């Protein structure tokens, strides 16, 4: 039986990977070929992405796969959402893309609502959760500042599209990544021209929109000559990593919610079309583009970012923990010592995350955690309770009964948090695959190659190849009591 080989570049906000996927009949295998860091650059008070370093790492990934001497069918790239690069008339990138955690957009959302368009009107047009860093507020800020990049740009390319441009020389706007921008109409699946008009941004700044599965172009001759490799097509997968991840949920029907767990936690349900009404407006729910015409009705939640930043601070102080050690510390710590709201603005990008947690506790009249184990446990418990808070909203919004929660992404390997989550929500949790973005990326390339035809066929293949972990709810009374305390704290 012939095998097909696909390269997935899966780039997150803290690291990137080159994954070689091999599909032989229904058997899918993944091999991590390279892994590399992705860190925000801090320059003169701003935060940027080093897109040139990312491009170099893509080249290293291609060279490493070439050593394996397998016939590669295609390449796909997925990244985090909202951020973008500018390209000038000569086709050169202008500077470095701003990172979504850059402080320049703080307060701009409220200013936009006051001076340009109300929050409700903007939500009615886009169905997207209002967040400071959405592309629309980044562009609003850059326009006000007469930013050099925007002023001299011929094209705006979202991050996966910018990287595929560097590989192919072809420019596209992939639908799922564009849907994170808060510039698209979810009904027409096109850019909202009225929004572009009020921003003072020309529609010509954006390349043609393509759906997941479209061919972008071939690797450039120069690149192939430099790396001594054959040219292969680059496919527009679901460029938003969460869209690729949700496509990899091993579900047999629609009676589920999903949680894509990583630096960010994205919880939601899959719908056949956008849901924009009073309830979604009130709860600030987002309608992002999915595969095969679906909508990812979801809520962005601060995820493992808080614990990652605690680990970073402790590393500077000379203490390092492996993942199992971290979970062991949390398990041994006292339960429900205090509660935090993971989405509190104080946790967005502080210099010292443990200090930010202590300040939150002081502000809400709680005793702060005392040990590293307590800090970690407080974060995990608070995340689980946050998931219950948000899932209750989706129970209201879903036309289908929610019978289980599928946790996908790197955070699905955290068995303690998975159990806490099952306890908090009172539903079974199905955890895995942890490599959901890469698997979705690869299977969308397989779909483009004609190996599978539909999203459900993709999921059927994935189901055969993953062995998820199952968690059943326990200690209902204890967790219900903790939830009431959590709610009272976050309202302070």
Where do the protein language model's features map onto the residues?
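N-terminal glycine/serine-rich phosphate-binding loop of ATP-dependent small-molecule kinases
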Residues: 1-95, 124, 224-234, 425-427
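Active-site core segments that coordinate phosphate-bearing ligands/cofactors
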Residues: 2, 7-8, 20, 113-126, ...
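Short beta-strand-loop/turn "lid" adjacent to the catalytic site in phosphate-handling enzymes
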Residues: 43, 63, 67-99, 129-133, ...
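Short glycine/proline- and acidic residue-enriched helix-loop micro-motifs
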Residues: 44-47, 119-129, 205
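Short glycine-rich phosphate-binding loop at a beta-alpha junction
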Residues: 71-79, 155, 208, 397-409
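Glycine-rich beta-strand-to-loop/alpha-helix junction loops that act as flexible
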Residues: 78-81, 212-213, 261-264, 404-412
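Pocket-flanking alpha-helical
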Residues: 85, 107-111, 245-247
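Carbohydrate-associated surface elements
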Residues: 102
